[in-house]
Amino acid sequence: MKEPDAIKLFVGQIPRHLEEKDLKPIFEQFGRIFELTVIKDKYTGLHKGCAFLTYCARDSALKAQSALHEQKTLPGMNRPIQVKPADSESRGEDRKLFVGMLGKQQTDEDVRKMFEPFGTIDECTVLRGPDGTSKGCAFVKFQTHAEAQAAINTLHSSRTLPGASSSLVVKFADTEKERGLRRMQQVATQLGMFSPIALQFGAYSAYTQALMQQQAALVAAHSAYLSPMATMAAVQMQHMAAINANGLIATPITPSSGTSTPPAIAATPVSAIPAALGVNGYSPVPTQPTGQPAPDALYPNGVHPYPAQSPAAPVDPLQQAYAGMQHYTAYPAAYSLVAPAFPQPPALVAQQPPPPPQQQQQQQQQQQQREGPDGCNIFIYHLPQEFTDSEILQMFVPFGHVISAKVFVDRATNQSKCFGFVSFDNPASAQAAIQAMNGFQIGMKRLKVQLKRPKDANRPY
């Protein structure tokens, strides 16, 4: 029969050919087993190399953890076996306390004596710096959750110890997941990922607007060629940022209101509205009196805008509905299901002659400048599969001026290889990014951030 305070253990680093009957002899020596289940994929049924283990008695679980966890390596494995309380168990059976506002002169023994009246202590450690000086805090682990809770109820804020600036702090220590979540929140705060409503006022307003414009340009650069609606979203984001920057009421751009003018714009002189409503950083394409675009104009994604028609020519209703939105009408092929009669203007790339050698050399120099000086380029490993250039750019912008940010993609599958690089313009920013982000956990991934090797060294990939 299982005891009420029995612990459910997670067992990792198990050879995939071992089943429950093979594992029982390893664990039975520590006590009677209530349940042992090998974890398998629910779709394929394949062994995942781990298991859940529950003893009838709590002491048996503690003995097994003490004797086996990272102490023994099973045949065929490169790393020692992992035996620890399962996540679901550790949340309900928290026994580890954080103790803050201790005096600098207090030792492990002093802290132990303070907490011994509440139960049996498994661990007691005062945190110290590299020079051995106490940091004024400690971790204390009891054998049971009830003992830890009793210590909190009695000692928290109950006294102020000599040398401390405020009353004693006693609380449950953060779990690994909570620490990871807090670090993500701190980085999100640095990146300006706040509520847009809360940031329409105050000191962060300008920063939010700049981020919106930056994100809009990135969205357009990386996804507009896939969908015209992505371009629409980018224009919308820049529109909102530009209007907010002038203290106006932002009116969303909607495809169904092409013939009307947003009230905020109609009530404002044209000169008061920023021109940064283009895609990929370009302003709307200028037209000549003939209605045709200037021959040397730059077009987003290398595609001609739909040319304006003369008054005598028949006006397509869809084009009329989107009058003035050249970036949206730059994708006539996307409307083939709605308006098959749309002409297909040739791409700008096909019309332009090859650039002269001098321009080609300048382009090569610009490409080389995308990498920073030695000591300013960092590699990031273990990126989440869904991360793109824009995500790592936003992640590392707080540490300094970013020259380039790139996620490596498999050309055959177009899937991320889960690593990339970021180039800063100075070594100090690179070092700050490494110190802050190396080991940072995103979901189940823990980032590895390090300096890029010199060009004459073997590349890590």
UniProtKB/Swiss-Prot annotation:
For this protein, the record's SMART domains field holds: RRM
The UniProt entry, under Pfam families, shows: RRM_1
User: Which subcellular locations apply to this protein?
Assistant: Nucleus; Cytoplasm
The protein's UniProt keywords, in alphabetical order, are:
Activator, Cytoplasm, mRNA processing, mRNA splicing, Nucleus, Repeat, RNA-binding
Q: Which GO terms describe its biological process?
A: mRNA splice site recognition; positive regulation of mRNA splicing, via spliceosome; regulation of alternative mRNA splicing, via spliceosome
Matching entries from InterPro entries are given as:
CELF3/4/5/6_RRM1 (IPR034648), Nucleotide-bd_a/b_plait_sf (IPR012677), RBD_domain_sf (IPR035979), RRM_dom (IPR000504)
Record's keyword annotation contains Flavoprotein: no
Q: What is its main location?
A: nucleus
User: Which residue range or ranges hold the RRM domain?
Assistant: 7-88, 95-175, 376-454
GO MF entries: mRNA binding
Look up the coiled coil feature and give its residue ranges. Answer: none
Please give the GO cellular component terms listed in this UniProt entry: cytoplasm; nucleus; ribonucleoprotein complex
Region of interest called Disordered, as start-end residue ranges on this chain: 345-375
Q: Where is the composition biased (Low complexity)?
A: 359-369
| Cytoplasm as UniProt keyword | yes
Q: Which Gene3D superfamilies match?
A: 3.30.70.330
Compositional bias ranges of the Pro residues kind: 345-358
The organism sits in which domain of life? Eukaryota
State the family named in the UniProt similarity comment for this chain: Belongs to the CELF/BRUNOL family.
What PANTHER family does the record tag this protein with?
A: RNA BINDING PROTEIN
Q: What does this protein do?
A: RNA-binding protein involved in the regulation of pre-mRNA alternative splicing. Mediates exon inclusion and/or exclusion in pre-mRNA that are subject to tissue-specific and developmentally regulated alternative splicing. Specifically activates exon 5 inclusion of cardiac isoforms of TNNT2 during heart remodeling at the juvenile to adult transition. Activates the splicing of MAPT/Tau exon 10. Binds to muscle-specific splicing enhancer (MSE) intronic sites flanking the alternative exon 5 of TNNT2 pre-mRNA.
- Name-wise, this protein is CUGBP Elav-like family member 3
**What species is given as this protein's source?**
Bos taurus
